[in-house]
Amino acid sequence: MARDKTRTTKKKERKNIASGVAHVNSTFNNTKILISDVQGNAISWSSAGTMGFKGSRKSTPYAAQLAAEDAGRKAQDHGVKTLEVEVQGPGSGRESALRALAAVGFNITSIRDVTPIAHNGCRPPKRRRV
């Protein structure tokens, strides 16, 4: 007597947004790219992990490039043409993600580094002994 479960999914409507903000969050382990409108509502996102990279390959510049291209293409489907870029974090995928967004065909108007700087805040992790 099990019923077939039918799911009703909301169709993704195509938003016509001319300009947006690309938030590139690059850590030592991963790179995440979120493209939002000017108010901060998310349009598209991607990360190195969602592109199929695992482990230490997520932190490579190539993984960040593929993630940025994926998020950029999704945003272009919604009509985004110009981007402001906010880069955050110390990772190696910052520059390659920025170049990939430009290569997709966006007109990049500004690039800002919004990495938080601690003023003698938390104690940093211990030095690695290799």
Curated annotation (Swiss-Prot):
Q: Which GO terms describe its cellular component?
A: ribonucleoprotein complex; ribosome
Record has Ribonucleoprotein as a keyword: yes
Name the keywords, alphabetized: Ribonucleoprotein, Ribosomal protein, RNA-binding, rRNA-binding
What Gene Ontology terms describe what this protein does at the molecular function level?
A: rRNA binding; structural constituent of ribosome
Q: A GO BP term, please?
A: translation
NCBIfam families in alphabetical order: PRK05309.1, uS11_bact
Purpose: Located on the platform of the 30S subunit, it bridges several disparate RNA helices of the 16S rRNA. Forms part of the Shine-Dalgarno cleft in the 70S ribosome.
Q: How does it assemble?
A: Part of the 30S ribosomal subunit. Interacts with proteins S7 and S18. Binds to IF-3.
Q: Which family does it belong to?
A: Belongs to the universal ribosomal protein uS11 family.
Protein known as:
Small ribosomal subunit protein uS11
